[in-house]
């Protein structure tokens, strides 16, 4: 553990941020998994709603610096591709 006051504060702050980031990352992954579950069931309406939620979570993660914008773009593109495949069928 740190001895210097500023280092102690940084350690506390870092731990808070780590917990917050883990929470946001978990919520993002959960939203994606929910979407993929609806795609498996071929439930178009619920899949469309879940896609919107997952897209928002990905965009929010980019804004907060959790993931890179290209990573979010790639994930959204793949999710959209899955959504379009069940809409077409």
From Swiss-Prot:
The UniProt annotation puts the region (Disordered) at 1-25
Pfam families tied to this protein: Ribosomal_S20p
Sorted keywords for this record are: Ribonucleoprotein, Ribosomal protein, RNA-binding, rRNA-binding
Q: Which domain of life is it from?
A: Bacteria
Q: Which residues form the signal peptide?
A: none
GO cellular component terms given for this protein: cytosol; small ribosomal subunit
Stored InterPro entries: Ribosomal_bS20, Ribosomal_bS20_sf
GO function terms (MF aspect): small ribosomal subunit rRNA binding; structural constituent of ribosome
Q: Which family does it belong to?
A: Belongs to the bacterial ribosomal protein bS20 family.
Q: What is this protein called?
A: Small ribosomal subunit protein bS20
Organism expressing this protein natively: Geobacillus sp. (strain WCH70)
Q: Lineage of the native species? A: Bacteria, Bacillati, Bacillota, Bacilli, Bacillales
């Amino acid at each position: 553990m740190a001895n210097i006051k500023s280092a102690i504060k940084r350690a506390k702050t870092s731990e808070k941020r780590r917990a917050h980031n883990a929470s946001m990352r978990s919520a993002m992954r959960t939203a994606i998994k929910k979407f993929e579950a609806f795609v498996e069931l071929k439930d178009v309406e619920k899949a469309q709603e879940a896609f919107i939620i997952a897209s928002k979570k990905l965009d929010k993660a980019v804004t907060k610096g959790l993931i890179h914008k290209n990573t979010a773009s790639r994930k959204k593109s793949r999710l959209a591709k899955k959504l379009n495949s069940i809409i077409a069928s």
